Amino acid sequence: MSKLSAILRRALALAARVVLLAALGICGWAFSVAAQDAYPARPIRLIVPFPPGGPTDVMGRLICQGLSDQLGQQVYVDNRPGAGSTLAAKIAANAEPDGYTLLLGSAATLAIGPALYRDAEYDPKSFVPVAMVAEVPYVMVASPKAPISSFSELIAYAKAHPGKLNFGVPNGAPPHMLAAWFKSLTNIDVVLITYRGGANVLSDLLGGQIDLAVETSSILLPQLSDGKLRPLGTPSSKRLADLPDVPTMAELGVPNFIASSWTGIVAPAGTPKAIVDKVNRAVNAALALPATQAKLQPLEAQAMFGTPQDYADFLAGELPKWIAMAKLSGAAAD
C-alpha cells in the first residue's frame, strides 16, 4: 500500500468518526428537545416554605390549580416549613433541574434566609427565575392604646421621647427587616420587640402591649376595617384601593421606604430554558384568568406578569435591598 493510500484511509476514518459524533450530537439535541416538548410527563411539585392555611400556602394552591389546568398535568403543593423558610429552599436547590420541582420564593426565602442562616447551603444563584406571581402591600399601624394616632405624631413623639415607643416584629421575618429599615431612614429611637411569629405580634398589638407594627394588608385589613387598629402609612408605591385614605410613605416624607410582600416561582439552577419558558407562559396565562383574579382579591394580592428575564431583573433590584435590610436589622436566626 502506498504512503498516499494510507494517509487517505486515515483521513476517511477520521471523517467518519466526525460525522458519527455529529450525528450523535444531533440525536442527543433532538432527544433533549423532544423531552422538553413532552414536558410535563408526570406531576410537578411546588414547594411552599410555610405551613398549610397561611397566605403563602393559599397563594401556592391557587397557582397550582391554574398551572394544572394550563399544563394538563397535576401540579401540587409540598409544604416544607422550618428554619425561616430555608429548609424548603435547600430542598429545592438540591433537586434535579428537570422542571418537576419548583419553589414558591419570596424575599424571606431568597434573600433574608441565606443572610441570617449560616447553614442555609444555598444562595440566590442556586435558582433560575421562572415567573413572578403576585405582590401584597404592607401597612404600618398603631395600637389604639398607643400615644399617637398619625404618622406625624409618631415621628414627633419618638423624637421627643426616645426609646419610649416600641415596635413588635416577628423575628427574622420581612416585617422585622422593614421596621429596622424604617428606624434607619427616619432616624428615630423606637425599641424593636421580637416575637415568634406574626400572630403573636398582632395579638399584643390589639391588646395594647406594643405600640407599632408593620404587616401585609391582607392580615391587617379586617382589624383596620373594624377600627381596632390605626393605619399610619403604607410603604407601597401608590395608595391602596381598600385603604384610599392611608398615605404612602413617599407622601409622608420617607420616599425611599418602598417595599411589598412578593412571591414568584423559581427552579433549580440548570433547569432547561425551554421548560422555564413553558412554565412561565402557563403562570401568566393562569394569572390572567378572571377566576384567578377573583381569588387573588381577598388576599389583597396584585398579579405580577412578565418573562423570566423580567423576573430576573426584578430580583436583581429586590434581593440586594432585602439582604441589606437583614444585615441592618441585626436579627439572629431562631
Task: Tell where the protein language model's regions lie, with residue ranges.
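N-terminal secretory signal peptides that target proteins for export/translocation
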Residues: 1-13
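Bacterial N-terminal signal peptides
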Residues: 15-29
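N-terminal (or domain-start) structured segment
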Residues: 35-126, 163-165, 171, 175, ...
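Sec/Tat signal peptide C-region and signal peptidase I cleavage site
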Residues: 29-35
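Short secondary-structure boundary segments
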Residues: 106-107, 144, 217-218, 236-237, ...
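Short beta-strand->loop
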Residues: 123-132, 168, 189-193, 211-212, ...
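An extracytoplasmic/periplasmic, membrane-proximal ligand-sensing/linker region
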Residues: 38-43, 251, 273-334
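Hinge/capping helix and adjacent helix->loop/strand transition within the periplasmic-binding protein
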Residues: 94-100, 115-200, 249, 262-295
